[in-house]
Amino acid sequence: MKFNVKMLSVTLGLFTSHAFAHTVYENARIYTVNDRQPTASVLVVDQGKIVYVGGNDGAKPFKATATELVDLEGKTVLPGFIESHAHPATVAVMEAGDFVYVDGARTLSQILSQLKAYLVAHPKANYLLAQGFNVASLGLPQGALPTAADLDTVSESVPIVVYDSGMHAGWANSAALNVAHVDANTPDPIPGKHYFERDNKGNPTGFMHESAMHNVVDAQQFNAVENVAEKLQPILKTYHSLGFTAITDVGDTFSTTVAAIARLNEQGKLKVYYQRGYFYDAAKSTEQNIASLKGLREKYHQGNLSINLYKLFMDGTIEMDSGAMYQPYPNGNVVEPFLSQKQINDNVAAALKAGFSVHVHAIGDKAQQSILDAFAANKKINPQLARVIAHNQVFEPQGVQKFAAMKDNLFLQTTPNWAVMYEKDETKTKIGQDAYHHQFLLGQAAREGVAVTSALTILRIPLMR
């Protein structure tokens, strides 16, 4: 089976009568994504629906009765874009509090100065959330990480959480940790993978990995359904302004986001087709996770909102030494996928059998290999359901060939935020020359007929503003 995007109303002569109010757009360069009619010059819209795409001859009856005739003067018209991997509701959580964007090239002292300046300019801020730092740029000794004590110099009373550029790690000040009731007795969500950095007495230092960090943000007072829904609406308007008509929100671990999305949907304010994903919860069994997703689907799946996607994580990121790689990192760490091969296979099979698409985060070559093998083992289960591997930074040796063997229902999704220039040298040092030259083999995969999609992941706050 082949997945092709088609315009719904490309056929000529869709209606026999043209006695209705409509707008005709002419003299356009229209790209249709239809092999039988790849280009056109006229587009007719009636009450928000495309009723004709074609040439001037077929458009004559529409022009004769048009309520509006728009000359596009050769401008290009494209079908609506589909955001294939994003976290708009996560951005809404970030925007729900006072937010500061941090340049990934900044040092620790520069970041602290930036946050102090923000609080001076906004003395009524009750909390502060920031995002964008890169550990390698902080100017710390090899292996050192920022701590709560660093952020306590910014404020001891205002809760502060700072995400890294990939949002797979971050750190908080003592006030934020206290709000979340994080102390030496707080268990790590997944020891060694989703966890709190600790001192030699077991006390959290303030630096956190994966869901440990998200749990601290989730506990902050600004993270309320009404605040998140309010901030999500302008984010979706920004997507609209960029030409997006559908979004795959692959999910998060926040307790407010699904309800916030559903609130907009119920109010008729969800103006895009919105697919929402469910994050696998390591504290639950496979059966319990599938049951949780089914419950969300039954409660919220209606109108423009679809909840039918199961999200798995194979690993973290290269910059945090948590991407699962065949070779050890320079510090000697060998990182395995977050899930065993049996867990991966069981989760993929269960989700597909339940009728859910499966969307998987994989950065390192070993992570990619694990999920490719799991998809291959379960290829015959509900083959009409899309499988997606996201990011695909470092390809395993047979990665392109394995993608090609499953190209009928497997999408290669990637994102540009793991290809930034200021991390180039750091990445080469961490993964070595061979793996470095096996990054983002998108062209090779596309030439093999693999469907390659790109996405924003996080719609940057500066872009929104």
Curated annotation (Swiss-Prot):
InterPro entries: Amidohydro_3, Metal-dep_hydrolase_composite, Metal_Hydrolase. The keyword Signal applies. Coiled coil: none annotated. GO terms for molecular function: hydrolase activity, acting on carbon-nitrogen (but not peptide) bonds. Residues 1-21 form the signal peptide. Pfam families: Amidohydro_3. Keywords: Signal. Involved in the control of extracellular enzymes production. Stimulates PEL, PEH, CEL, and PRT production. Belongs to the metallo-dependent hydrolases superfamily. This is Exoenzymes regulatory protein AepA. The gene is aepA.
